[in-house]
């Protein structure tokens, strides 16, 4: 009987599924510390999405690729605020009772960033095309959820975006120029004709 999955594939899937369980548990731990109704909506929506995505991946792996990944759709977009405006000092809390909305959102953001990396690395080790696509979509979903949380944090001043002087930004951006179209290279057979 032929193997259904490669060793690397199974180990990466194991890591991704364990990470999903940990993320779901982590979000449930955060919930009592969130106070802002908007953050609670984001937390609940994302937790439900992660649970559904986890169940779909488990089913897909057990059915050897049957199923389809679903993209995460954040309900809104906004214009980011750039620059620093008296950022609050940051330090670890001395007890869990001190956790606030900023801590919850920051923890969610870190979870999504780490999961996006893990899922993309797992996709690169995956031989099964359906599971590979599901892991790739999972990485994109994490990036979308991270951006939704980041928007919330940026809007509230929890995650401010430092900027550089405009001349520095323009210098770096304009340093790169479009590439010229590559010249067609003769193939090995064509080179022999020139000799």
Which positions does each model-derived feature cover?
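Acidic, metal/ion-handling microdomains and their immediate structural contexts
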Residues: 4-11, 15-62, 124-125
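Acidic/histidine-rich alpha-helical segments that form the ligand environment
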Residues: 9-31, 85-137, 193-195
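Generic structural signal for well-ordered, non-transmembrane alpha-helical segments
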Residues: 18-21, 44-51, 55, 109-113, ...
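Conserved alpha-helical segments that form or flank metal/cofactor-binding pockets of metalloenzymes
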Residues: 37-82, 146-156
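Carboxylate-rich helix-loop segments that flank metal/cofactor sites and access channels
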Residues: 63-107, 162-182
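Preference for long, well-ordered alpha-helical segments
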Residues: 111-179
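Tryptophan-rich aromatic "cage" segments
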Residues: 179-195
């Amino acid at each position: 009987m032929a193997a259904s999955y490669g060793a690397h594939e199974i180990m990466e899937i194991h890591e991704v599924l364990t990470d999903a369980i940990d993320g779901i548990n982590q979000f449930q731990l955060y919930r009592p510390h969130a106070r802002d109704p908007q953050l609670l909506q984001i937390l609940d929506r994302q937790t439900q999405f992660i649970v559904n995505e986890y169940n779909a991946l488990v089913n897909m792996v057990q059915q050897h690729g049957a199923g389809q990944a679903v993209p995460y759709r954040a309900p809104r977009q906004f214009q980011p605020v750039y620059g620093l405006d008296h950022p609050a000092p940051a330090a670890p809390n001395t007890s869990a009772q001190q956790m606030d909305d900023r801590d919850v959102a920051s923890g969610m953001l870190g979870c999504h960033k780490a999961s996006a990396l893990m899922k993309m690395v797992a996709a690169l080790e995956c031989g099964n095309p359906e599971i590979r696509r599901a892991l790739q979509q999972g990485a994109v979903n994490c990036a979308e959820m991270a951006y939704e949380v980041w928007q919330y944090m940026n809007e509230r001043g929890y995650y401010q975006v430092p900027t550089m002087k405009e001349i520095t930004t323009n210098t770096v951006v304009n340093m790169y120029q479009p590439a010229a179209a590559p010249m067609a290279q003769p193939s090995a057979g064509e080179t022999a004709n020139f000799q």
